[in-house]
Each structure stands twice: as structure tokens, then as C-alpha cells.
Amino acid sequence: MNMEIRLAQPDEYETIAAIWYESATQMDGGAPALDDPSTLSDRIIRSVEKGWCLNVAVADGHIVGLLATIPEDSILDQLFVAPEAQCQGIGAALLDKAKQQLATGFTLRTPVTNVAGHRFYERHGLRVIQDTAHPITGAPVRRFGWRQQATEG
């Protein structure tokens, strides 16, 4: 599989929204309070305007994953891989890209029910910070953090 990670283009936001929605709704426990797929493109536009750095993973000419970071706040905000492209190293490559973009460290949150996601993040060196409530929806989330270790990079 030939894959690259690059900045997303505005004409790709609909495709990105579809992958985001499909992946989020299929993760363990689903995605509480996720926007309707028809409005996710608008949410992407607003988020990019507010400071998202939005990257896509492209394999064999097709977008198969997304990574949204907020560099100013050291946050990995969204990381999703299309269900049919999972377990092929794409998520790990996107997470490595986040580690490059946010080299001093970052935090993220994921639903408490997303057990597969928890295992993925822990396998890739992230540590649990705390279980808490999502600041907007109130849904239970687990916060993870990553800091570059002296032996990395």
C-alpha cells in the first residue's frame, strides 16, 4: 500500500466528514453527541478557521484517515481511520505525525467506552491522565497524554 500524510484541502472536507462519521459511530460505544454527517463539513470549516491543523492519510489515491491537531493548545483533537482501512498501520502513522507536529507533547480525550482506542494509544506510548466529563457534552471521557522521552526521536 502506497500511503502519504498531507494537509487536507477544502474540497476534501466532505470526504473527511464521511470518514469521521463512519469511524466514530463504529468505535466501541459509539460517539456521543457527534454532529449529523451533513453538518460535519461545516464543523470542519469552523474548526480549521479556529486553528485546527488538518491532515489526511491518502492510500492508493483515496483518503483513508484524518488527523486534527490544535498546535496552539497542544491537543490532538481528532484521529480517525476509515473502518475498511484499519489495522494497516494508518492510525500509527497519523499518531506519529501528531508527535511530529506537537513535539513537546499533547493531550487527547476519547470516550471511556472506546476500549480499542485506549489500547491503541497505550501501545503507542500515551499514558492515561484521568477519566472526566467532556467539557461540552458531559459524556464520560478518558484523557491521555504524550510527552517525548529522552530516548525518542
Language model region names:
Residues 91, 95, 114-117, 134-140:
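Short glycine/proline-centered loop/turn elements that form peptide/ligand docking sites
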